[in-house]
Amino acid sequence: VFFGYATKTDGETIKLEGARNCLYWSKDMRGFMGLASIGPSKDCRIGPRADIELRSITAVLDVVAEAVKRWEDAP
C-alpha cells in the first residue's frame, strides 16, 4: 500500500511524489482501507519517502485529512 501525492490518477501508470509505503498494517486498521480513512497507527510500519511511478494499479483511494497527517507524521 502506497500513500503519496498525484495530479493524475487514470491510465496504466501513476506518478506519486513524496510516496510512502506501508510495509505492515496492524489489526486496528481493519484492512488496507483503514489506512485511507484513519491513517497508520503507531503499530504500522511505514517506509521513507520517495518519488515513484506505479504500474498496473488496482485501486486509488482518497485519503481524509486526519489520515494524511498520520501518514506525514509516521516515523
Which residue ranges define each predicted feature?
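Conserved RNA-binding domains used in RNP assembly and mRNA/RNA metabolism
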Residues: 1-75
